[in-house]
Design a protein with these regions (language model features):
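Inter-helical loop and helix-membrane interface segments of multi-pass membrane transporters/permeases
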Residues: 2-5, 33-37, 67, 72-95, ...
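Membrane-embedded translocation segments of transport machinery
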Residues: 2-11, 189, 193-351, 355, ...
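Extracellular loop-to-transmembrane helix junctions
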Residues: 5, 35-62, 164-165, 410, ...
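Transmembrane helix-boundary motif of multi-pass solute transporters/channels
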Residues: 12-49, 258-261, 276-278, 282-285, ...
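Transmembrane helix-loop junctions in multi-pass membrane proteins
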Residues: 24-33, 40, 176-187, 208-225, ...
Length: 512
């Protein structure tokens, strides 16, 4: 087995874990979800979901990762196999490798858009806004720009992205692979130490600029902050707001991806996980709620008002970040610079997340198949380059893959993590494993949250999503949707075969 790497410093670990969580979702998805679900009406369920679902699942993944570090393994494949003496366990654990791997196939492509936009902002090639009071017409040039660059206006099965879009995707992929090639400490950790402070500096500069904006109607930043933070207790009876809030907590903390488990496997077996996990989550929440919410939402409320902001958010996940904000920046002094800063911030945030999503696959190749770091990254790079052509060129494939692995799959895997650790393995042993050698004491009431409440909430989310989304998803018959499904099936079969090969060469080294 290849000797496993370790983090070089505690601050590097915390920044890397925070970088894993701080991604495009913090600055693109959170503002859209909050604006679409009533601003302050969204924040109460969000905070409750963070305590009852996000933090407990985060600590569970940290504990699973530290458990894996004792055994010399960094993915749920082997960790589940140790915890549950059943041949099926390792195949369930495969979700913790396949989900982040499938997500990063399209995530790096979306990430590359931000690099393209930052470059076009710098050279002044983004669209200008028309003179109109109609919000839809105001944003139309930026909507057309995104459609044109990604080829979404194609009428048939195949998309026709612009050449520069493809070039920026290749550049983005190569940047990710270079960082991964350097390793955990010299690559991921080193990048996090530079990228995370830069993300915060850029976000604070943008937030300060947004707070100085005003509209002819007299709206200012206080209106935007009021929309986000004034509580609406009537929303507590709206199940859709709760589901949206719980879903956002999943995305923002990166639970259910398996990446936290893998990152935690590179700590020493007696290192703290409680404080490290909480510190990483706190950095992430500051980036999302304070910075992410104070840029896109506040700017949009100032320029367009609350009803129009909610309308923009309801029309798509990219509308605030890729359309409303650049349109706003196009109409302020030095707007090109602030637009460049915004998209560069998104790119850095995207990179720190995408390299984390790649790491479980690399850890699997290293730990279970004995690949070297370089060989693992090369194999991963070839796969990602080939597989990314599906979401780049096939209409409907990206949305289909995103639903099954980037939405539904996250909840399924997180449920397996909680059930296997606290029910199948042994809840008392799980609690002992989770609370040992920590710098802070985890309150005992979290034992009941992790054993009963968190799994119960996950089941409720799964049932609700199944009722609300599965019927329409399963009835899709367009070729792009089927290509996305076939891709997931083929990836799963390859994963099963690799596990079979790895365990076949183990000579009884594990439980199966």
């Amino acid at each position: 087995m290849v000797k496993r790497e370790q983090w070089g410093s505690r601050i590097g670990l915390i920044l890397a874990v925070a970088g894993n969580a701080i991604g495009l979702g913090n600055f693109l998805r959170f503002p859209v979800q909050a604006a679409d679900h009533g601003g302050g009406a969204f924040m109460i369920p969000y905070m409750i979901s963070l305590i009852l679902l996000g933090i407990p699942l985060l600590w569970i993944e940290w504990a699973l990762g530290r458990f894996g570090s004792k055994k010399g393994h960094g993915t749920a494949v082997a960790v589940f196999d140790y915890l549950w003496k059943n041949p099926v366990a390792k195949y369930i654990g495969l979700l913790g490798v396949l989900i982040p791997l499938a997500v990063v196939v399209y995530y790096t492509y979306i990430e590359s858009w931000t690099l393209l936009y930052s470059f076009f902002s710098l050279i002044g090639k983004l669209p200008s806004t028309p003179v109109t009071e109609n919000v839809s017409d105001y944003l139309k040039p930026f909507s057309h720009f995104l459609v044109e660059k990604t080829g979404q206006d194609a009428s048939g099965l195949f998309l026709t992205p612009a050449l520069e879009t493809y070039i920026f995707f290749v550049i983005t992929l190569l940047i990710n692979l270079y960082i991964l090639y350097r390793g955990v400490s010299a690559g991921i950790e080193k990048v996090a130490k530079y990228a995370m402070p830069l993300i915060f500096v850029m976000a604070i500069i943008l937030m300060i600029r947004v707070f100085t904006l005003s509209s002819p109607d007299g709206r200012n930043f206080l209106d935007g902050l009021g929309f986000l933070w004034n509580p609406d207790f009537s929303a507590l009876t709206n199940p859709k707001v709760w589901l949206a809030a719980a879903g956002q907590v999943f995305f923002t903390l990166s639970v259910g991806f398996g990446a936290i488990l893998t990152y935690a496997s590179y700590i020493k077996p007696k290192d703290d996980i409680a404080l490290n996990g909480l510190a990483g989550a706190s950095v992430n929440e500051f980036a999302e709620v304070i910075l992410g919410g104070s840029i896109a939402i506040v700017a949009s409320v100032i320029f367009f008002g609350i009803p129009a902001t909610a309308m923009i958010a309801s029309n798509g996940a990219f509308n605030l970040g890729f359309m409303a904000l650049p349109a706003i920046f196009a109409n302020i002094p030095y707007g090109e610079f602030f637009s460049f800063l915004w998209f560069l911030l998104l790119f850095f945030a995207g990179v720190t997340s995408s390299i984390a999503l790649c790491q479980p696959a690399i850890a699997f190749l290293e730990d279970e198949l004995g690949f070297s770091r370089q060989k693992s990254v090369l194999a991963l790079g070839i796969f990602l380059f080939i597989a990314a052509h599906i979401p780049i060129f096939i209409k409907g494939a990206l949305d289909e893959i995103d639903f099954w692995v980037g939405t539904f799959g996250l909840v399924v895997f997180a449920l397996f993590e909680a059930v296997i650790f606290f029910w199948i393995y042994n809840s008392k042993e799980a609690w002992k494993e989770l609370t040992r050698d920590n710098d802070i004491k985890i309150p005992y009431f979290f034992y009941y949250i992790m054993k009963y409440i968190a799994p119960g909430l996950l089941i409720i989310i799964l049932i609700s999503w199944s009722i609300e989304m599965l019927p329409s998803q399963l009835t899709k018959t367009d070729p792009g949707a089927w290509i996305g499904r076939i891709f997931i099936v083929i990836l799963t079969i390859i994963g099963f075969l690799l596990i079979k090969a790895a365990w076949g060469n183990r000579n009884g080294r594990t439980h199966t």
